[in-house]
């Protein structure tokens, strides 16, 4: 089977009702990003950070995978598929995909404030006073601005092995994820799916599809299945 790597971003989950990462005004669901998604914000007002992520975690139980998520899961019948997602939701998992690398963490897990390897699955609200086994406060298992991306090397390794790379639902503006495609083999076929794909200044070997995730995957599926054989 050929190796297919998917790099997914907020655009694919937006079609399930999850708001995209940031609006044009630099706010994230009405919040200053640095207030709710940085070590600075956590130190300044941990309760505000917890409230923000508790709200987002609750929202997960009100949304469902869309046809684009399901199409990517369907491709496992034809390819060795690895999904590298910038999203912190679980919609790829619920759609049926089996190999998913969450580059920026997950809403449904929390970790020790002191030890990033002490991680717990968590579906309820997280509160001040909820402690890890090392007695430190639990925090969202999210890679915040200013923090290293621990799974970056693994993601780069997957991209290097890809015969085919599909970039879907990302503006390619959040680094280091935005530069992942540059690690693809020179002979790899690359598709970039985004409503504003044509505005991106990308190399000629990247085929831009100026559509939403759902529409583009519906159109592309027959070709992808044919190419797998």
Curated annotation (Swiss-Prot):
Keyword Cytoplasm: yes
Source superkingdom: Bacteria
Predominant location: cytoplasm
Catalytic site: 104 (proton acceptor)
GO molecular function: histone deacetylase activity, NAD-dependent; NAD+ binding; protein-malonyllysine demalonylase activity; protein-succinyllysine desuccinylase activity
GO cellular component, one term: cytoplasm
Annotated binding of NAD(+), by residue: 9-28, 86-89, 169-171
Class in the EC hierarchy, top level: transferase
Binding site for substrate: 53, 56
Keyword NAD applies: yes
Subcellular location, record wording: Cytoplasm
Reactions this protein catalyses: N(6)-acetyl-L-lysyl-[protein] + NAD(+) + H2O = 2''-O-acetyl-ADP-D-ribose + nicotinamide + L-lysyl-[protein]; N(6)-succinyl-L-lysyl-[protein] + NAD(+) + H2O = 2''-O-succinyl-ADP-D-ribose + nicotinamide + L-lysyl-[protein]
InterPro entries: DHS-like_NAD/FAD-binding_dom, NAD-dep_sirtuin_deacylases, Sirtuin, Sirtuin_cat_small_dom_sf, Sirtuin_class_III, Ssirtuin_cat_dom
Alphabetical UniProt keywords: Cytoplasm, NAD, Transferase
Residues covered by the Deacetylase sirtuin-type domain: 1-227
Known EC number: 2.3.1.286
Family: Belongs to the sirtuin family. Class III subfamily.
Biological function: NAD-dependent lysine deacetylase and desuccinylase that specifically removes acetyl and succinyl groups on target proteins. Modulates the activities of several proteins which are inactive in their acylated form.
Domain observations: 2 residues (Tyr-53 and Arg-56) present in a large hydrophobic pocket are probably involved in substrate specificity. They are important for desuccinylation activity, but dispensable for deacetylation activity.
Name this polypeptide is given: NAD-dependent protein deacylase
Organism of provenance: Helicobacter pylori (strain ATCC 700392 / 26695) (Campylobacter pylori)
